Amino acid sequence: MEKTWKINLSGFADEINPQLDEQIRVLKKLGMHYVEMRGANGKGLVEYPLDEVEKIKEQLDENDIHLSSVGSPIGKIPITQDFEEHFKLFCHTVNIAHVMEVPYIRMFSFFMPEGEDPEKYHDEVFRRVGRMADYAAKHNVILLHENEKEIYGDVADRCRKLMEEFYSDHFKAVFDFANFVQ
């Protein structure tokens, strides 16, 4: 008996158009039912209050479109910037994931100061990522660390260090091939 595989494609619809109606129209035309949402109507998803996130979810549900992941800016701040406000945004992002009924949140490991050795910031990166990973586990979401140019995890060795420390049911990796060649 031949085995049949079903593959669900997902993408960033805000690259189609910033307006949610147009994103939905094109996704439906392409037969896609999943999107990794970064933004809708010209605004980042994590910038919306939860009541507006619920309206976005209703609009997606009406069109049989679901999130594969919250495409967040979490961890895309300088490592030298205060973390507390960003952690509040992270907690809000976890709430958004619950409203959107998706366990996955794409995140990053903080921009490094230009010209400085990223290992100088190892302890602070790990403190911050560890705090988020602990929160993710307590709130049953899965963080997906993406390699990204100019962040701590912008090379394979440091991505490996992050995975060795944090890999769990609530912390995984997303690999963007282009980010290692930029």
Residue ranges of predicted features:
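Active-site groove signature of glycoside hydrolases
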Residues: 97-118, 139-149
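N-terminal pre-domain/capping segments
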Residues: 1-102, 168, 172
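Gly/Pro-rich active-site loop or hairpin
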Residues: 24, 46-49, 81, 116-119, ...
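Active-site-proximal loop/turn and secondary-structure-junction residues that shape catalytic pockets
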Residues: 13-17, 39-41, 73-76, 109-113, ...
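Acidic/histidine-rich catalytic cores of soluble enzymes
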Residues: 5, 9, 34-37, 70, ...
